[in-house]
Each structure stands twice: as structure tokens, then as C-alpha cells.
């Protein structure tokens, strides 16, 4: 049962890291390649939403680590 707990913890950590990376990559496209999204009239709104989602995933990751890192992370 302990193995499952560690795997669940690790899966959540990877989920949040993956979400953050996906949002960061999309934001990079906006910043570096505006031509790719040139016909999209809501750049700032969309970018703000991506930052909000990344911040939420980051907060979840921090809270998970704060609450459970000592118990479930593999050192």
C-alpha cells in the first residue's frame, strides 16, 4: 500500500509540473511568435488566463509538497 501512496504523490507532482510547462510553452508562443496567433484578437486576455492557470497549478504543487513531501516523496 505504501508504494501506491508514493506513486499517487509522484503522479500529482508530475501532473502539476506538466501543466505548468504546457502553459509556459503556450505563453512563449505568444511572446515570441505573435504571427502564429496574429488573427487572435484577445491576446492579453488569453495570456492572462494562461498565467492564472499556471499559478493555480504552481500553488497546488507547493501545497502538495508542503503537506505530504516528507511522508510520500522518494528521496
Question: What annotation goes with each model-predicted range?
Answer:
Residues 2-75:
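Extended, charge-rich alpha-helical interface modules
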